[in-house]
Regions:
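Conserved catalytic-core motifs of eukaryotic protein kinase domains, centered on the activation segment
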Residues: 34-36, 59-66, 126-129
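Conserved HGGG/HGGXW glycine-rich cap/lid loop of the alpha/beta-hydrolase fold
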Residues: 9-60
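Flexible "cap/lid" loop of the alpha/beta hydrolase fold
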Residues: 102, 106, 112-144
């Protein structure tokens, strides 16, 4: 799997197809494999880029000082778009990735041509109140993993 070094740390990503760029943004506690049934169907006409974002199921720890808040992850996605030198991107966000994609579109609109939101968090319900304790715990765990560079993952 290709990797790219960004100011926040190293991000793994998959890339398939050629054509106008589409970047897929997954939600919390999943990784880019969420899009495995989607991207092969689009790859004939589109360049599909699927990063593994630091939202709980990534395999490479971020730098200890990386901002892993939603706004920080949105900056990371913006930095990824810049590093890949893509413009007029179709940004597709699911779940928490939809909320992050909205932030990317606001802050990096010069690179985003279209925004597709699928079953996602948005507006005043991000994160949903029931998930606030889990999200705060997950961010704390991610920080600990980054500091020790050991995310405590097993297998795969």
């Amino acid at each position: 799997m290709p990797q790219i070094t960004l100011p926040q740390g190293t991000v793994r990503y998959e890339e398939i197809g050629a054509g106008p760029p589409v970047v897929f943004v997954h939600g919390i506690l999943v990784d880019g494999t969420l899009w495995d049934l989607v991207t092969p169907r689009l790859a004939g006409d589109l360049r599909c880029v699927v990063p593994d974002l630091p939202l709980g199921s990534h395999r490479v720890a971020m730098n200890a000082d990386a901002d892993l808040s939603p706004a920080g992850v949105a900056r990371l996605v913006g930095d990824l778009l810049a590093a890949l030198d893509v413009e007029d991107v179709t940004l597709v966000g699911n779940d928490t990735g939809g909320a992050i994609s909205q932030l990317v579109a606001l802050d990096h609109g010069e690179r985003v041509g279209r925004l597709v939101l699928t079953n996602c968090d948005c507006f005043e319900v991000f994160p949903p109140k029931e998930f606030v304790p889990m999200v705060l715990h997950q961010v704390a765990e991610l920080r600990l993993g980054a500091e020790g560079q050991d995310l405590g993952r097993r297998g795969r």
